[in-house]
Amino acid sequence: KKEGYLVGNDGCKYSCFTRPAQYCVHECELRKGTDGYCYAWLACYCYNMPDHVRTWSRATNRCGS
């Protein structure tokens, strides 16, 4: 199992700045995670997801490129 920031097809973290309070929890559960939250009101962070779920990494960041 892994944890981390959800990543969209564009390589960017899932934004939650203007989303409802339960948005990240729902998105994490859709990916079989057990919980999640909106970190600093900026991006969705998830816990206990399957290892195959893509998460953001500084080393592989391609957001904005």
UniProtKB/Swiss-Prot annotation:
It comes from the Eukaryota. Residues 2-64 form the LCN-type CS-alpha/beta domain. Disulfide bonds join C12-C63, C16-C38, C24-C44, C28-C46. Keywords: Disulfide bond, Ion channel impairing toxin, Neurotoxin, Secreted, Toxin, Voltage-gated sodium channel impairing toxin. It is found in: Secreted. GO terms for molecular function: sodium channel inhibitor activity; toxin activity. SMART domains: Knot1 (SM00505). GO terms for cellular component: extracellular region. GO terms for biological process: defense response. InterPro entries: LCN-type_CS_alpha_beta_dom, Scorpion_toxin-like, Scorpion_toxin-like_sf, Scorpion_toxinL, Scorpion_toxinL/defensin. Expressed by the venom gland. CDD domains: neurotoxins_LC_scorpion. The keyword Signal does not apply. It holds the Pfam family Toxin_3. The keyword DNA repair does not apply. Has the structural arrangement of an alpha-helix connected to antiparallel beta-sheets by disulfide bonds (CS-alpha/beta). Beta toxins bind voltage-independently at site-4 of sodium channels (Nav) and shift the voltage of activation toward more negative potentials thereby affecting sodium channel activation and promoting spontaneous and repetitive firing. This toxin is lethal to mice. Belongs to the long (4 C-C) scorpion toxin superfamily. Sodium channel inhibitor family. This is Beta-mammal toxin Tpa2.
